Amino acid sequence: MAKVHFIGIGGSGLSAIARLLLESGHTVTGSDRVLSPFAVDLQKAGATVYIGHHPRYITGADWVVRSSAIPDDNPEVQAALAANIPVYKRADFLGQLMADKTGIAVAGTHGKTTTTAMIAWVLTELKRNPSFIIGSGMKNLGVNARAGKGNVFVIEADEYDRMFLGLRPRIEIVTNLEHDHPDCYPTFEDMLTAFESFVDLLPADGTLIVCADDKGTAPLITHARRAGKAVVGYALQSDMTINSPNWIQARGLKLNTLGGFSFNVASNLSGGLSSVSVDLQVPGEHNVRNALAALAVVELLGLSTQKAARALASFSGTGRRFELRGEAKGVTIIDDYAHHPTEIMATLAAARTRYPGRRICAVWQPHTYSRTQILFAEFSRAFKDADEVIVSEVYASREAKQDFTSAEVVSAMPHASARFIATLQEISQYLIDHLQPSDVLLVLSAGDADQVSADVLAGLKKR
């Protein structure tokens, strides 16, 4: 067994790979700026995690894996190269991990994490014992990765830094396509080109499963067909525009007592028309689409859709994806990772469905200057389903601080109850002072605003 050192081990991507290697019997060490919850979990699982970066941390490593956020001049990268230790980027290392398994890669602008988790959960329940890597912890199993004994490997395929082009899956899912990551893809056409290259990676016996009622995927479907790839389209019946010999669709959506949708699924993937009923507890029409993608995978693998439907009914979601953090003083507090206008609108719509008639207060922490400025107009219009909107200052993430404030987005909002409060601490105190019984607090952030949920929950209990 090898000793593998991870630079940036606390992130969702590298922490998942590290867990996979730990479960496979390898020795794992890693370093990061801070000790994240993912890193704490890895310590409990047997990894050695260092805070900060130093050349001595790579001592004895057989391989080094670096996050895409780690620069070339990182002291551990430099020390590894000087010692002739192989240094891999995440994408290249993942490709090697998947080489001997049937790879299922989930890509797209929105819904990757939940769809990946649904597929992994269903295959686990169907006794296929899959390996998987997810961008967040799956609630049903409490982990974001697992080294399974089966021959299937399910992975969330991140398009940032073109990471997904290092994978070699046999089944690809593309949930939707919208312009995102402008620091990596200046235009939608740049991003589409990367996704076309992703589709080109499919082998002769591979299949593209794609949401066919998403406008952004239309050129990708055209490209896949011209390249001779097998294509399966999935869609809601109300939006059905599939012109494909292979399809799966949801019909008769109805709200259920679990808080999600119940619906019937029709498909022609098994050689003739088939149908199955599904009852979801995760809310929103977007999760119906995610479930369709999971069922398409099940059919392609020749497994029981009836058993898969039962597994989907027990699927409880992933961390920070419409995650109920708690209730206090009659206030319901929910965390969500939404950081793109379309994701925000879908999450607010799901909240309206789950909590009809209740006042919804949305807290949004903009994620990166580039995304906030490129999608400025879209963000300003994304909050129509919220009764009150509170916007913090931008979370810069990997970007340098800029002469821009998200107060400008608030000024452009047509919303009557939108306000800018710069710091998370000030936002938490405002909410503790002003939230009322029956309010729903929805915290939308891909940064560190989940601390608002924890602080407000604790503060309300003391109020």
Language-model features, listed with the residues they occupy:
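Structural beta-sheet core signal
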Residues: 6, 30, 132, 172, ...
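N-terminal leader/targeting and accessory segments in enzymes
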Residues: 1-93, 215, 252-254, 283, ...
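Phosphate-binding loop of NTP-binding sites
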Residues: 20-26, 43-44, 57, 68-212, ...
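Conserved hydrophobic helix-helix packing surfaces used for dimerization/oligomerization
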Residues: 4-6, 64, 104, 130, ...
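Short internal beta-strands
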Residues: 26-33, 208-212, 361-365, 385-395
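Beta-strand->loop->alpha-helix junctions that form or flank phosphate-binding loops
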Residues: 29-32, 50-53, 88-92, 133-136, ...
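Nucleotide phosphate-binding/pyrophosphate-handling subdomain across enzymes
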Residues: 2-5, 13, 17-24, 171, ...
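C-terminal helical cap/extension that packs against the catalytic core
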Residues: 380-437
